[in-house]
Amino acid sequence: MYHLWIKCLAAWIFLKRCNGVHAMPAKAPMYPNEPFIVLWNAPTTQCPLRYKVDLDLKTFHIVANANDSLSGSVVAIFYPNHLGVYPHIDERGHFFHGIIPQNESLTKHLNKSKSDINRMIPLKTFHGLGVIDWENWRPQWDRNWGSKNVYRNRSIQFAKKLHPELSEDKIKRLAKKEYEKAAKSFMRDTLLLAEEMRPNGYWGYYLYPDCQNYDYKTKGDQYTGKCPDIEMSRNDQLLWLWRDSTALFPNVYLEIILRSSDNALKFVHHRLKESMRIASMAREDYALPVFVYARPFYAYTFEPLTQEDLVTTVGETAAMGAAGIVFWGSMQYASTVDSCQKVKTYMNGPLGRYIVNVTTAAKICSHALCRKNGRCVRKHSDSNAFLHLFPESFRIMVHANATEKKAIVKGKLELKDLIYLRKNFMCQCYQGWKGLYCEEYSIKDIRKI
């Protein structure tokens, strides 16, 4: 009965969005008057400090931690060995903390997590992204396939050791029940602890929600990009996680096989669509902010995204109504002076200019359509409308002097531009505002803030 209610709720929200109506307001943006932001979450500290290569992130409207570090006051990412005593098996087969969640003390984990959060985020007024990156196992038994099947096997062994008198069938059912209960407790209680300690942060788990639409390698031209129904249903069953999250962190990493292809857009679009669906069903008062993880280079390579794929990732993310995009990267970006220079060159070329284009266009649309009280979202999520600067009305220039370099946008919105925006986009009002153009105070929403 509970699962049926969730499905009905999800279907109602989906119909609302398809009809171009936002049933819920959005949380106010992370920074005032910045409806769509781009953040940097790559370990590039060595570029400015060791190699004296400034990546010019600030120049192109990218928000980053101090010294371009991986974790800080803007984005704090917690890997398995950074937060508590996370039970798991690593990629090399090493065992940690009882391997499975039901074989480790939750109290011990939370006590250690508390000290880890204080160490990594000393500022109690932390207002950044708190991203917990636990990818070794999934909280749902049926999603632990492939290499993650080891957690099911270990759980069965654990249950059999405690209850040798039970039949194989009962052992498997008990193992599943105990595993899911413990996994839920680990994930939920960790999240609630983090939110209690740093209540102004945006907390959630990396790669949640997922869509499992990775079959582009086998489907070829038959690939639709759609999330399998079973995976959407499983996401519905994680309502407990969405309710306790204060942000969502899906990813849209592109492999090189998708370069400049129709399949790339299908892959990204449906992952975003599922994330926005989950964001709208998580709470009663506002849709969760979605910060989408992307890579400026193709996954597992050091080859920059094409202009077309920048539109596919950054452009699609903004047009679908996400709060921002987070660029993640590997140590390779800062491994040598040449690597740093390659990132800088890309930043000063297509990447930086496109980021300025989209972030500025999102701001202009928010001003023109939503009176700065909401963000622009496609009226029809499957359309090909993007939040881009109108080339006949605006131009991007980079000004540099002895002390700073800054990208500046010059121009003004023309009537024909406004007509285009009104035709293709609608306002998702921030909490406290309502109306077609977010022009009215909403006393009901203000009381909830």
Curated annotation (Swiss-Prot):
Sugar-bearing residue positions: N67, N103, N111, N153, N357, N401
Catalytic activity: Random hydrolysis of (1->4)-linkages between N-acetyl-beta-D-glucosamine and D-glucuronate residues in hyaluronate
Domain of life: Eukaryota
Disulfide bridge positions per record: C47-C340, C211-C227, C365-C376, C370-C427, C429-C438
Enzyme Commission numbers on file: 3.2.1.35
Domain named EGF-like: residues: 427-438
Localisation per UniProt entry: Secreted
Keywords annotated in UniProt: Disulfide bond, EGF-like domain, Glycoprotein, Glycosidase, Hydrolase, Secreted, Signal
Pfam families from the UniProt entry: Glyco_hydro_56
Biological role: Snake venom endo-hyaluronidase that degrades hyaluronan to smaller oligosaccharide fragments. In venom, it is not toxic by itself, but increases the diffusion of other venom proteins by degrading the extracellular matrix. In addition, it displays antiedematogenic activity.
Record text on subunit structure and interactions: Monomer.
Family that this chain belongs to: Belongs to the glycosyl hydrolase 56 family.
Protein's name according to its UniProt entry: Hyaluronidase-2
Annotated organism of origin: Bitis arietans
Lineage: Eukaryota, Metazoa, Chordata, Craniata, Vertebrata
